[in-house]
């Protein structure tokens, strides 16, 4: 096994341990806690693949980090921090909108990579807006925390969330999932808009009609796959 692969796993295990200790003191925000959950799944999978015990790897990772910190000057640390863009958390939804319970009369569930799409196909002829809470880096969507679809009356009728068993996703995964959700809701003659904030950070632009600039391939997929499965 490549020594770099082993040492990388050891360092990741120790850094996860530090972040978990921080979170246990109730000081982590939503994106921070979400990354801990996703990374835990990833580390367990890597442990099985590499055949390395996580506890032993964590101890070895601690020694590696301690050695690096002993050699690190304050000036080098400042330069490294300055060169890394900080993620920020963007909220379309209120805490109440994000946490409220909702149910589906005619449930429909689909998957787009590591994302789960749920929608109520009993909803007809409604004006619907998609809102999301997510983290941003380099002015682009980095990690989707939760996306929900709301009618103009405020009812929750759809959702996109991460699958705990498949941690990690890309902005393309998010855009594909949004396309599937829009296609499913529009099949029942609903009018769907995407919030300007989500458009701006996921697609880099926003349209007044609330329709993101989907690629032709995505448009065909939205129209075709949903029709055949509903």
UniProtKB/Swiss-Prot annotation:
Region (CPSF4-binding): 180-215
Short motif Nuclear export signal, span: 137-146
Region called RNA-binding and homodimerization, residue ranges: 1-73
Extent of motif Nuclear localization signal: 34-38
Post-translational modification: Upon interferon induction, ISGylated via host HERC5; this results in the impairment of NS1 interaction with RNA targets due to its inability to form homodimers and to interact with host EIF2AK2/PKR.
Pfam families the record matches: Flu_NS1 (PF00600)
Annotated segments matching region PABPN1-binding: 223-230
Record GO biological process: symbiont-mediated suppression of host cytoplasmic pattern recognition receptor signaling pathway via inhibition of RIG-I activity; symbiont-mediated suppression of host gene expression; symbiont-mediated suppression of host mRNA processing; symbiont-mediated suppression of host PKR/eIFalpha signaling; symbiont-mediated suppression of host type I interferon-mediated signaling pathway
InterPro entries: NS1, NS1A, NS1A_effect_dom-like_sf, uS15_NS1_RNA-bd_sf
Region listing for Disordered, in residue ranges: 204-230
Cellular component GO terms, alphabetical: host cell cytoplasm; host cell nucleus
Subcellular location per the Swiss-Prot or TrEMBL entry: Host nucleus; Host cytoplasm
GO MF annotations in UniProt: protein serine/threonine kinase inhibitor activity; RNA binding
Swiss-Prot/TrEMBL keywords: Eukaryotic host gene expression shutoff by virus, Host cytoplasm, Host gene expression shutoff by virus, Host mRNA suppression by virus, Host nucleus, Host-virus interaction, Inhibition of host innate immune response by virus, Inhibition of host interferon signaling pathway by virus, Inhibition of host PKR by virus, Inhibition of host pre-mRNA processing by virus, Inhibition of host RIG-I by virus, Inhibition of host RLR pathway by virus, Interferon antiviral system evasion, RNA-binding, Ubl conjugation, Viral immunoevasion
Biological role: Inhibits post-transcriptional processing of cellular pre-mRNA, by binding and inhibiting two cellular proteins that are required for the 3'-end processing of cellular pre-mRNAs: the 30 kDa cleavage and polyadenylation specificity factor/CPSF4 and the poly(A)-binding protein 2/PABPN1. In turn, unprocessed 3' end pre-mRNAs accumulate in the host nucleus and are no longer exported to the cytoplasm. Cellular protein synthesis is thereby shut off very early after virus infection.
Family: Belongs to the influenza A viruses NS1 family.
Oligomeric and partner information: Homodimer. Interacts with host TRIM25 (via coiled coil); this interaction specifically inhibits TRIM25 multimerization and TRIM25-mediated RIGI CARD ubiquitination. Interacts with human EIF2AK2/PKR, CPSF4, IVNS1ABP and PABPN1.
Domain writeup: The dsRNA-binding region is required for suppression of RNA silencing.
Name of protein: Non-structural protein 1
Species assigned in the record: Influenza A virus (strain A/Gull/Minnesota/945/1980 H13N6)
């Amino acid at each position: 096994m490549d020594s770099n692969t082993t040492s990388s796993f050891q360092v990741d295990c120790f850094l996860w341990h530090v972040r978990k200790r921080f979170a246990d003191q109730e000081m982590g925000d939503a994106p921070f806690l979400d990354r801990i959950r996703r990374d835990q799944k990833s580390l367990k999978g890597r442990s099985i693949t590499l055949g390395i015990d996580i506890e032993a790897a964590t101890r070895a990772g601690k020694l590696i980090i301690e050695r690096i910190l002993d050699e690190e000057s304050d000036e080098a640390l400042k330069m490294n921090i300055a060169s890394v863009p900080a993620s920020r958390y963007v909220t379309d939804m209120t805490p109440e909108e994000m946490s409220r319970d909702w149910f589906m009369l005619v449930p429909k569930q689909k998957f787009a990579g590591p994302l789960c799409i749920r929608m109520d196909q009993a909803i007809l002829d409604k004006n619907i807006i998609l809102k999301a809470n997510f983290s941003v880096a380099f002015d682009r969507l980095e990690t989707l925390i939760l996306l929900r679809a709301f009618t103009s009356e405020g009812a929750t009728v759809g959702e996109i969330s991460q699958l705990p068993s498949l941690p990690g996703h890309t902005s393309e995964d998010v855009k594909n999932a949004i396309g599937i959700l829009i296609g499913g809701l529009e099949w029942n003659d609903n009018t769907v808009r995407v919030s300007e904030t989500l458009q701006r950070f996921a697609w880099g632009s926003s349209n007044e009609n609330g329709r993101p600039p989907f690629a032709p391939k995505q448009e065909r997929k939205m129209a075709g796959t949903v029709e055949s499965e509903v």
